[in-house]
């Protein structure tokens, strides 16, 4: 009466779900990485300018 999923079907659905999530949220991850890179560059510039003042 109750139909169960086989291990292969469950594994396929899991992989498909993870791949779909990565595809959907990829722009969010890219924007975060870009923001972090820009912030790191700004911090280096601030530190260099402070070192020059000293």
UniProtKB/Swiss-Prot annotation:
One of its GO terms (biological process) is regulation of endoplasmic reticulum unfolded protein response. Keywords: Membrane, Mitochondrion, Mitochondrion outer membrane, Transmembrane, Transmembrane helix, Unfolded protein response. The chain crosses the membrane at residues 5-25. Residues 30-36 are annotated as: Required for interaction with CLCC1. GO terms for cellular component: mitochondrial outer membrane; mitochondrion. Residues 1-4 are mitochondrial intermembrane. It is found in: Mitochondrion outer membrane. It is a single-pass membrane protein. Residues 26-54 are cytoplasmic. Plays a role in regulation of the unfolded protein response triggered by endoplasmic reticulum (ER) stress resulting from the presence of unfolded proteins in the ER lumen. Homooligomer. Interacts (via C-terminus) with endoplasmic reticulum (ER) protein CLCC1; the interaction occurs at the mitochondria-associated ER membrane, a zone of contact between the ER and mitochondrial membranes, but does not appear to play a role in ER-mitochondria tethering and is not affected by ER stress. This is Protein PIGBOS1. The gene is PIGBOS1.
């Amino acid at each position: 009466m109750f139909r169960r999923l086989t291990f292969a079907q469950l594994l396929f659905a899991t992989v498909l779900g993870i791949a779909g999530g990565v595809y959907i949220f990829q722009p969010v991850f890219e924007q975060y990485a870009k923001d972090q890179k820009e912030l790191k560059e700004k911090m280096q510039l601030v530190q260099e300018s402070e070192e020059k003042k000293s």
